[in-house]
Amino acid sequence: MHRRALFLSGLAGPALVQGFAFMPEDQLLALLRLGGLNLYLRHAITDRSQVDTGRRGDRAGQRNLSEAGREQATRLGRAIRALNIPLAEVLTSEVFRAKDTAELAFGPERVRVQAELIADDYTSGSAGEDAHATSRLLARPVSGGNRVLVGHIVPLGMILGRGLAQQEFPEGAAGIFRPRGADWEFLGFFRAEQLIRAAGI
């Protein structure tokens, strides 16, 4: 059944996601090295003393990466390169914590802002419509490597059909999707520390 239809209708989304049989880490790594997957990467660790205002383009009015988050993003990029995981493109939310994560991990020259990846409290339209558009993007096949989408926890929960706990999808984690054109298959989560450990850095 089409995953996006479940999100839009609100039918059986939680049961579907809970029924996923996540792949073991070594199998996921092998698939990532082959390319053709979509990685929904949550921004790196943030400074929780800062409060979001919902104002776009206002760094001082947003929750930004902490020093630990900047280091995490840099190490995550190094880990992906060390693991020989090929990348075709890197798309990001315009919110600074996501854009900074993308640029620190993959280099500013590779990063392109994608409007629908915006955080739910910064959207100028409907968070549901943005999540729907992102779900379509996750279903879109990619050649020449993997596609990285740097975004936020709430939109991914909307796409999967249930709220995600911080422990389940912490800052710096990635959800791995196999695109099928008309829909997608969710393969599981990778935490940042898993990739960093696997790379031995």
What are these regions (language model features)?
Residues 138-187:
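Active-site-adjacent alpha-helix immediately C-terminal to a catalytic or transition-state-stabilizing loop
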Residues 5, 70, 183-185:
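Residue-level signal for well-ordered, solvent-exposed loop/turn and beta-edge residues enriched
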Residues 1-21:
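N-terminal export signals
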Residues 10-11, 105, 159:
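Hydrophobic residues on the short alpha-helix immediately C-terminal to a glycine-rich phosphate/catalytic loop
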Residues 22-115, 120-123, 128, 163-174, ...:
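Active-site-proximal alpha-helix that buttresses catalytic centers in soluble enzyme cores
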Residues 103, 135-139:
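A broadly conserved amphipathic alpha-helix scaffold signal in soluble, globular proteins
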Residues 127-135:
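Internal catalytic-core helix/loop-beta-alpha segment
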